[in-house]
């Protein structure tokens, strides 16, 4: 008979733990066959293990490289097109001119002709450089001089303009005499006022252009502009934005209440990434503000570049650059003279030493302008007479180069103006320039619209181009060959993501009116008002509608005060005194109907409010989100030419939105509940007395939304696992974990020979970058100070406290309770806090809620009354008025107050308890549901006569806190640092808990088993059933001694026996840990180009048309190895070149991979091997496993390096010691420190275990001796240092790459294994994904007969 079993999975982003569990919570062992050429034929293995792998990465790096390649290719193409236009005429003047230019990079012996690139002779070349020291001298000369000039010089000037053509951020015409600093400042103020509540800077109408374009320091500019706004503080938010705008570094930590610094500076290369990180914390709605600040900054920069006021020149940019050049020359002469006189001993360092940040380093290119200025300031600061230099440095106008970071602020129109001037002058002498003027200008002005994408011919994964013809695309025929409209449609389809819940529906733009309306109602539906009588209630449908029309349509940002004013006017009879449920910190709604306010400035209000126009408005916002290109916006808005005026279209063109929502129109306002025919938005607007929000509506079993979503998520073919997993929404890292877990399940089912009863899944949460939780704890003191002040207490004056100390919850609760016992009102003594109890308002018997909201400080838990319910009525009667004061001062939340006073409303009801059950059990994360769905569809394929699924395999999803609670309860401590077994143990405990819960509470099955079951309602069941388990935390049965059986009398849980089994499994020394072998992909080598030298190790930068010898041109080093190969072949030895058979490891780089795979034998012969036979080549990807003497294992890192391959196993008591050592810093839990103190002698035993392990497997004798000496010198005086040192010591024994660690504050350097010779005669172990199947190859036996 087939024995039933369950599979447990613990899925993470770089590991998957797995376990097979039988009915009595044991893990079976199987005798597994071993293939290969060793004496081992079978090994008994426990069906318990973990797969470790490098986590999946996003495609960002690949994308950045791809776009850079395209940019350079297109730039090169522009130059080739220009040469094509010039070629015929240039042939008459100098037919080898273009060849010489192309060869200018090459060393003399590699050139095809003369070594002087422009004129081909030294004399003319020298004269040219004297006349035109920079290209800008030539550009101005050609633009302003009416005489005929050598055609070669005309080409050089135009090629420079076309190569570095400026940015395209400004559309249409651009006046170089007026670059709009004032207008852009006004635009910035408008966005600023829109973004921040109660800001009206725009109204002050100040003139700033003169200040911002003046030659004064950045700080002076900021200060002068700030003075024009008398109400703005010098350390305020507006001042911080001014810092940014003038080009200084700003830090928004304080202004957005962030935990860490948030520095931003427009001139930094990392600006884009730093802004992205900031917006991830504060919200995308600030993106437009930073964009308008950046436009203003660029415009100020440009005014600093275009410094020439000479109206006569037709080349203002070139003239400004010449002025910069001349100033540089004069200032350099002055600086040299000054340093000779005042600092003669420093002269050589400044002007000759390239390694320093002086002038030599600056001109060489190693030192940037910022570092050079810093160096000079340090040198000149206290020297008399250096004021001139320091003043220019302060203005950032000293010894400036021609090519600097701020050249990025030059619009292409300025270059175009110079190009036209040059062509106009020279076309008189070269008519072909006039004939081809449009084509030449097009080379400068034409850009491939981003919505057309790459111009590939159907061979690229990244192209979506639609063509009208197969001809080659050039800047001049683009509109004839490319179907822009179809390409734009395809772009829309690629750009928009799919809904998380309805995977075949596209999401709405973030600024869609429908989406914004949804977010407003979703937030509003959970806001409660409080009346004078102390009654609290949700807003009804009528009030919500009135608030939406009267507040959200009137104010862009809705604050608590604005809503209160409205309610006082419109709902005076309700006597509303307070609101709860808003963002506590800022007292504002996070949601806004902002797009409505934007469109109100352009379109008629009646048009916006007319429901018939909803579709049109959604399409307009979609267009404004997808396209920045005004021409395309105009084209798409032509569909509404009968509704929109030309003026309105013009205004809409300038409006651009960014960002996407996460939900589709179909989900929000498409699918309807079967009975009521209402959509989700309809329910948010009017939900009777329930006032459910979005998450509650889609998870409510009484409505059909849940069923509709489940139906929409059914996947088709499940055989192609890669496709199935790639289609779900989630990061590459978590998808990689999911894919591996599905493969593991397949292998386990194959080994067991039949399907499991249950598959229990738990998924790790990814580290998402959210500041909310951390910000809350970081801001404890700030919030406390305000509330204590409101409460009218002196407690903070009497007992001052630092924010860091408030991380101790006991102390924090003391202040939140104003130093009094929460249940008696008596004073507590701050010096004896450790003797008081922390009590859970809702007992832990029902739910593990350790939040501040569920805990109070009391002199004794007895003070609460009954221990199995909320605090008693007597306590409530006595303390309610005190609690109310705490609530008014915001020292406690409404939720805490409601729970404290619950007894007067009958205490905990059955419904409450049903809710607790759900919160503990029901995994709400969508990604986990996706995994459950995939497993369900792979294993449960049969249906009954009613077409209902027959679920033979139950897919159980568990919340991760169930396992951690279970571990704590039975002291099954987890210390990740010891080894990787904890992944397997978590999977095992998941299976245990899932299996036991299913047995003990079959009626709870629908809550955590995937599928369409009738759901359980606590209050609808008969009272006896409800009582049976509802009066407890669902995990409590594990602790009780009574035996639990199922309806057939089978034992499900027998505490002593089963806990004993569990402990036994967790102490198994044999757990199958597999490090996934992976072929390396990506770049060929490190990216730095190294200078030429005699090294043979350099890789040439070019090999195709022309070979760039690394001895002449330098090259790359550190090629990335795709995989290694073990080869047995002959090599020639000694002078006689006698053949000798060798066994060797050869690294195959990513660059060589294709050559090797095409013909391995020829590849190795080129490397000097002879008599190579394919059967004597073994491919070894990274992390291949080798076994050596005494069970020592090594992983292959590369052909030249190994890593550690053994896992240390510790006895239970040492695991317990390390658990407490790891948590010793927790002030709230003194038991950890006590335990370590009592058992500190066990660290000696731990060191012995590590020492024995190290001698056998790690083999780092020097390090081991150093560790022992340090332990002897520091024998446990400082317990915290002792504890952290031994946690760090586990790095020494950990599997994988060796790493440096600290032991008693001294660095223990890593011991690298840089010889791979020892594995050539070891046993190679090929493992399957679970490690249960193995092929062992004794490399000693290879290569013989």
From Swiss-Prot:
The keyword Manganese applies. CDD domains: Csn1 (cd09643). Residues 770-921 form the HNH Cas9-type domain. The active site is at residues 10, 840. GO terms for biological process: defense response to virus; maintenance of CRISPR repeat elements. Mg(2+) 2 binds at residues 10, 766, 983. Its cofactor is Mg(2+). Its EC number is 3.1.-.-. Keywords: Antiviral defense, DNA-binding, Endonuclease, Hydrolase, Magnesium, Manganese, Metal-binding, Nuclease, RNA-binding. HAMAP family: Cas9. CRISPR (clustered regularly interspaced short palindromic repeat) is an adaptive immune system that provides protection against mobile genetic elements (viruses, transposable elements and conjugative plasmids). CRISPR clusters contain spacers, sequences complementary to antecedent mobile elements, and target invading nucleic acids. CRISPR clusters are transcribed and processed into CRISPR RNA (crRNA). In type II CRISPR systems correct processing of pre-crRNA requires a trans-encoded small RNA (tracrRNA), endogenous ribonuclease 3 (rnc) and this protein. Belongs to the CRISPR-associated protein Cas9 family. Subtype II-A subfamily. Has 2 endonuclease domains. The discontinuous RuvC-like domain cleaves the target DNA noncomplementary to crRNA while the HNH nuclease domain cleaves the target DNA complementary to crRNA. This is CRISPR-associated endonuclease Cas9. It comes from Streptococcus mutans serotype c (strain ATCC 700610 / UA159).
